[in-house]
Amino acid sequence: MEIEFGILGRDELMESVELATRAYMTYEYFTNFFPDPKERYKVLMSMQYRAGLTNFGKTHFLTAKVDGKMVAFAQIDNPQYKRPSVLQFVLHGWLLVYLGVKIKHVNDWLAMDTLASKPCHDYQHAGSDIWYTSSVTVEPEYQRKGIGSKFIAFWEDYIRERGGKELTLFTNSEKNLAFYRKNGLEIFDERDILLPDGNKMRSWSVKKTL
């Protein structure tokens, strides 16, 4: 199986959104906040599309393809990346994310994402030449076939070529954590995230020196 790695084209944005939505539909990061599958699907499609539009050209979107089909996608932010302003998100249609879904569910998820990503952002800003992977997905039917590990190796080369010395990311899945550790990332922070129903979700932040 030949894998082609590259940079996402603007005309491929919707394809990346659809891929990520399929992969994220069973991820604790979303299922805990959007228990209804129909609402979860709607939010995932809308949220990722609007975020992609807002961030396009401001960060690094990487892909892996097999026979021309996109099978993996990642957003990797360099140390100079600045999150777009609220106005920029609004101008790219962010308010449409709330259309037809429970506003509280979206706001609870956004609050969780800020808290869960904080250790990585703090670590990135405290050091130098550290890149942050804010999103990574592999097409479900292509998981456990070695594509994810090869995709990470591609990021590492991509980051090194641009002067990066470390990468960091977080996950809320034990399965994903085991995968990242197998690929050389080490835990530097772990904490519980309080869920709206009073339960807790574990969050692990990991890093790797390149």
Write out the residue ranges for each language-model feature.
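Conserved acetyl-CoA-binding loop-helix of GNAT-fold acetyltransferases
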Residues: 138, 144-157, 182
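Conserved GNAT acetyl-CoA-binding A-motif
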Residues: 130-131, 159-172
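Conserved active-site alpha-helix within GNAT-family acetyltransferase domains
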Residues: 149, 161, 173-190
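Conserved catalytic-core motifs of GNAT/GCN5-like acyltransferases
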Residues: 168, 186-204
